[in-house]
Amino acid sequence: MIGVIGVKRNVDIAIREKLALYPKKHKKYVGELLNSFKEVVILNTCNRTEIYFNCTEEISEDEIFDKIFNVFNWNDDLKKYMFLSKEKRAVTHLMEVICGFHSRILGEDQILGQIKDAYKTAISDNSISSELQKMFEIAIACGKKFKTECKMFEVPVSSVSISINSALLKGCRKFMVLGYGEIGKLAIKHLLSHKVECIYLIVRDKSKASDLEGEIVEVLDFNEKNQVINEVDCIVSCTAAPHTVVRNEDIKTEGDIIHIYDLAVPRDVDKELSEKERVILKDIDEISKIDDKNKKIRKERMEEYKHIVEESIEEFLNWLKIREVSSKIRNIKIRENEICSERIKTFSNKGNGENAKLAERMIKSTADAYVNRAIELLKSEALKGSDSSCAEIIEKIFLT
């Protein structure tokens, strides 16, 4: 059984923080999950916590919740904020997620790269091997095709772009970016495409961003951030830290207005900062509610290309159906080879060499024609969901 358990949409950030997973514990999580599930993929982003699983035995929904909650040491009171989808609903969920239909900012395509990373990590961890591997391969192809054909780049959107565009409209020209992961890199790229006065990039390893040092970008270590934090108009924070990185005492009470966009989950910025008159603080939930002129265009365009999602769902479900009869197909081919060998051996004992070779080709060709037709019929009936009676007849003909 294939399934996914994750945080429901529109759950408040205060709850999502409690369900966030820490990357440093990833190996431990996977090892423990594989004690209960055949395959596992963990999708853990700043806005999404989802565990995709495949189990060979039928287990109840309560058991699934208990097993996963025990691994992550989550409080049982948080179960009401989680969803569980199985079989086709789980497949549909992944295909829609990778195309941006479930993103807090509709159409945000960063999720495609995040799912690709989760898949690569699962391959590296040896935590997927069959159904989940195929499902993610089809999903990634679906996401790429959707992104290419939908051409969402013509209507750009992300939490980063919305945050920075909002700050620029408010007159911000001096920026600080905290963190240089995927989101941090997007923030820097976006800022460099606009006329800003200066950018302070705060990182834990300055060597990873040394190529950015230039006229308007200054790379600083985290312990240097407070030297300049009160000089900027805007802070964009997007670290993967499990703790607060911008504390209340870091920002002086007096001074010019400072806009802070906290894109992290758990939150990077002390929420008490919003009580200071000079601070305008927005977390990821508030950022996703900022209306932008492209929202309606994105929604209409995505619906127009929804057929790509539906086709990918059907492709995977058909693969599953064919896979269910694959063992029967293998047995039929094995039996075909055995029968051919017996007939060829019998003929060879009676005829000369030249005739024997010709007979071998004829026997094999005739057997292939009938067996391949039987296999085609079996596959066709499997796709219709009526393969059991067909398989029974074919087994009686070829395997008894």
Swiss-Prot record:
Catalyzes the NADPH-dependent reduction of glutamyl-tRNA(Glu) to glutamate 1-semialdehyde (GSA). NADP(+) binds at G179, Y180, G181, E182, I183, G184. HAMAP family: Glu_tRNA_reductase (MF_00087). Pathway: Porphyrin-containing compound metabolism; protoporphyrin-IX biosynthesis; 5-aminolevulinate from L-glutamyl-tRNA(Glu): step 1/2. Possesses an unusual extended V-shaped dimeric structure with each monomer consisting of three distinct domains arranged along a curved 'spinal' alpha-helix. The N-terminal catalytic domain specifically recognizes the glutamate moiety of the substrate. The second domain is the NADPH-binding domain, and the third C-terminal domain is responsible for dimerization. NCBIfam families: hemA (TIGR01035). GO terms for molecular function: glutamyl-tRNA reductase activity; NADP binding. The keyword Transcription does not apply. The gene is hemA. This is Glutamyl-tRNA reductase. GO terms for biological process: protoporphyrinogen IX biosynthetic process from glutamate. The record marks H93 as: Important for activity. Belongs to the glutamyl-tRNA reductase family. Its EC number is 1.2.1.70. Homodimer.
